[in-house]
Amino acid sequence: MLEQEKIIEHLDAVFRDMESRLNGRAGSLLHNFHKASFEALRSTHFPDRKHEDWRYTPVQRLISPKYKLAEKKQQYNISEIQELDAFKIPVINGHVILDGVDAALKSAGVIIRPLQEAMQISSPENNSTRWLHKVMNTSNQAFELLNFAFHPGGILIEIPKNLSLSKPIEIQIIHDDPDISFSHPIYFI
């Protein structure tokens, strides 16, 4: 079996595992986006040394590990990270912890929505859905499709026009999963 086929076979098992965890979200816009991305990935080859942009990158070493889905932590502790005076949005193992978002950020007028919820909004101003569909329809890049197929979600951060915040927004990305896993959410700001 060719290396590419072995990798797709493994990713297929991971994708089925991801679908088994949807808990009522099967058929949602986000799930359909994952499926379309994975189907496109099946027919797209990963680059190799013959591709100029990837000549010096050991692509096989990047894609050959047995990736799994990142586990969502129920409890987290980020107090060990040196403090920056900022509004904080914690992301642990690729999952945005909405309960951990600084309440002052929300009260300042910033709207933070999970990507799943943001995709449900039908509006011409819905940049997340418009951008995702545009990129999905034009992408033939294997790594881009891989990220789209396996991202654990993401967030849309809406900052009203002319809003001035007293401090920056810090997205705290923490990965403590001991296994090699997919933990790359999509952010729209």
Which residues does each predicted region cover?
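Glycine-rich and polybasic anion-binding loops at the starts of cofactor/ligand-binding domains
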Residues: M1-I189
